[in-house]
Amino acid sequence: MINQQNTSNNVIQELQNQIGEKIITSFDMVAQDRSNYFAKNPYQHQRPSIESANSIVNGYAKCNGGISAAANLVPGPLGMLAVAPEIITVMRNQIAMIYDVGVAYDKQQYLNKELLAGVLISSLGTGLITPGINAIANRVIIAQGSKIIARKVSTPIFQDTARWIAGKYAQQVLKSSVSKWLPGVGATAMGLWSAYSTKQVGNKSIQIFEKEIEILDDTQSLNECSIEYTDNFLPPSDIEVNNITGERLELLKIKTLINLMKVDGSIEPEEKEYLKTIITNANLTSAEIQEIKNSLSVQRIEVDYSLIAKYPDDALGLLIDLIALAKRDGDFHITEKMYIKQVGKLMGFSEVDVAELMLSC
């Protein structure tokens, strides 16, 4: 279990490095590109409006979903390194989307790299600026009543912020078991993640740009600060998860996938092969494997989804896996939809979020 966790952490670190170095310069590059575009199209009827904000978001979400769904996945965590270029493209499109939404809300004069990064960071939580990521978000963006303050920071601080964002994205991508081990179905899972995350970024952009924006130059006062973006934000080890939940997350996820396969009355041979691949690579103990074998004859396995809900990235990864598996044959059964909606609700997702995910890709 420890070896697999080390491998996963190493892959996250490498993905973070590959994505981070490209994303550091992407904020300024994309902002300049979009600024040039709107300078060439200066007339009001050529510019996005508040009324078009949702269609802007939907357009980028569809585009990003298609990019990731076409990715050529290789089995195993190390194979996920091959999709770094697609992840970078998705993130750049998300930055462009934030800029376009900002223009729609007539906030173009405030759209510097710090504000763009702050919107992206805030979309990784559940509130406007979620307390759990305040330590990072507050470097570049602060919610103060009805006002949003974007803080101009020094180059080293911004670079650390961009690397943290890259690490968070790498961590989210690797939460999908289907993406890692079932390339044929995994491409669908990647497409779902890209479309969903883009929609989340877009919705957060609208929420933020509805407010008053102010720019604060903090390059001097924050010059000596640094962000601890590596150790504190890597996923907890299997042992830590076991101590917290009493049952490892991977086992809970597999039980949930089995329930999905059983929802139409029986587990098909193809589904058994999928299950075998995931179990083999989950690095389960012999006792856990035996528990799974025993549960195959049970009509429905009991799973405490509140335990998974404590880990939002894992919960999202599981929800995406469920939808990708259900859609694999092109026939998304009503019983599968009902089960996924129920699981999503128990893990804390809104009906709207689950519905949007099921409609993606």
Which residues does each predicted region cover?
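Small-residue-enriched hydrophobic alpha-helices in membranes
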Residues: 2-5, 66, 100, 133-155, ...
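Alpha-helical membrane association modules
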Residues: 2-226, 251, 267, 272
